[in-house]
Amino acid sequence: MEVSYKFGFDAAHHFDNYPEGHIYRGVHGHSFQVEVALAGEPDPKTGFVADLGEVERACRDVRESLDHRMLNEIDGLALPSLENLSLWIWRALKPRFANLARITVRRDSQGQSCTYTGR
């Protein structure tokens, strides 16, 4: 069984590894959507796979670290691709949730997404 929580944030980034004049090289921003999924069987005492209030609080911390920031300036996001952003969020949340199953980061306006499952 899987439960999930979604949140969004807006941030800017650039990719210095692209040639001069390439659209990705310049600073630009996106609205990102994140889905955090936890898997397991419901706890017989609570009926929950995870306390979604606790998940929401943890995601609020992640959101505050990313929202309206230059992603390149955040430790571990020098190359802020969807892939690296998914991994960064995983690493931020995994210590708090042993049953973390997947992180999906989307840029819906671009039709793009990346899902990381710990492998």
Language-model region placement:
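Charge-rich, low-complexity N-terminal segments
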Residues: M1-R119
